[in-house]
Curated annotation (Swiss-Prot):
Record keywords, A-Z: Endoplasmic reticulum, Membrane, Sugar transport, Transmembrane, Transmembrane helix, Transport
Source organism of the structure: Danio rerio
Role: Probable sugar transporter.
Motif (Di-lysine motif): 325-329
Protein name from the UniProt record: Solute carrier family 35 member B1
Gene label: slc35b1
Localization per record: Endoplasmic reticulum membrane
Length: 329
């Protein structure tokens, strides 16, 4: 009798709160270090023979990242899932990978024009396109509290990104505007990615590791063609030959990305893309603090007020925001 009760007792992993806590902590730890490595690679000055240069190979960086992500997902499937079948349509993985890598390349490229805290707060808008496209395409319905929380996030991000006109038109202002456009493109593609992922989990019950593997394999294929066609990969190899110390940071960057993506796709499968986008946003405040402390990026009082609004909205969402009432896949 006692043995029967013990056998029927659910495992700790079946507890939704435990599962969510593991996903959140995994995302937080992995992407905190990921963000530091990203800024170290893309914003550092590299000096060779008295000449300074910047890292300008965002596409190749994402290409390497996708290879490591796919390899890691394959290992997870091999050791933990065995012969479990995946019935998801291949074209859905292809569409998801195109929007996913487009968002990533745009976001990484934006770092060449804006500092990391600006990029992070800009990407904090991610729940907005995920919600909008979910409502318009998948016919999701959210409670009013959810929309209020999103409004607070939008207002906070707008305050953070706003810069008063100092009365002169400089190239810096133009460059900042281009960075904003890259962030906007990245957010739109994030929303499309969320819609496709929601459809896959609802229609095909796609597993986290299979989603991670196939999305990254498609991304590797597309990016491999892109970097070979443009010749960027050869310029990247020449750059690493001049600065071999960067290879260590790139490998660490790829490993932290793979670990972080494991928790990201677990969150998508178990809790949905909107919850995942909110999780990835809440950890950004600590990423910003880390960037400010380590790299000396200055944040104004208005930007701090915007930051407070962003995370006030996220806090209210955690307390009052409910799951969508209806989803049509």
């Amino acid at each position: 009798m006692a043995a029967g009760k013990a056998a029927s007792k659910p495992s700790l992993w079946q507890n939704e709160r435990v599962r969510f806590a593991v996903c959140f902590c995994g995302v937080f730890v992995c992407y905190f270090y990921y963000g530091i490595l990203q800024e170290t690679i893309t914003r550092a000055d590299y000096t060779h023979a008295g000449k300074k240069e910047k890292f300008r190979y965002a596409t190749t960086l994402v290409f390497i990242q996708c290879i490591i992500n796919a390899a890691f997902a394959r290992l997870l499937i091999q050791f933990f899932e065995g012969s479990k079948q995946d019935h998801t349509r291949s074209w859905l993985y292809g569409l998801c990978s195109l929007s996913y890598l487009g968002a990533m390349v745009s976001s990484n490229s934006a770092l060449q024009y804006v500092n990391y805290p600006t990029q992070v707060l800009g990407k904090s808008c991610k729940p907005i396109p995920v919600m909008i496209l979910g409502v318009t395409i998948l016919r999701k319905k959210y409670p009013m509290a959810k929309y209020l929380c999103v409004f607070l996030i939008v207002g906070g991000v707008a305050l953070f990104l706003y810069k008063p006109n100092k009365g002169s038109s400089t190239s810096d202002e133009h460059v900042f505007g281009f960075g904003e456009m890259l962030l906007l493109l990245s957010l739109t593609l994030d929303g499309l990615t969320g819609v496709v992922q929601d459809h896959m989990r609802g229609r095909f019950q796609t597993g986290a590791n299979h989603m991670m593997l196939n999305v990254n394999m498609w991304s590797t294929l597309v990016l491999g063609i892109a970097v070979l066609w443009s010749g960027e990969v050869w310029e990247f190899l020449a750059f690493t030959d001049r600065y071999p110390s960067i290879i260590y940071n790139i490998l660490l960057f790829g490993i932290t990305s793979a670990l972080g993506q494991t928790f990201i796709f677990m969150t998508v499968v178990y809790f949905g893309p909107l919850t995942c986008s909110i999780v990835t946003t809440t950890r950004k405040f600590f990423t910003i603090l880390g960037s400010v402390l380590l790299f000396g990026n200055v944040i104004s009082h208005m930007q701090w007020f915007g930051t407070i609004l962003v995370f006030l909205g996220l806090g209210l969402d955690a307390k009052f925001g409910k799951s969508p009432k209806k989803t049509t896949h």
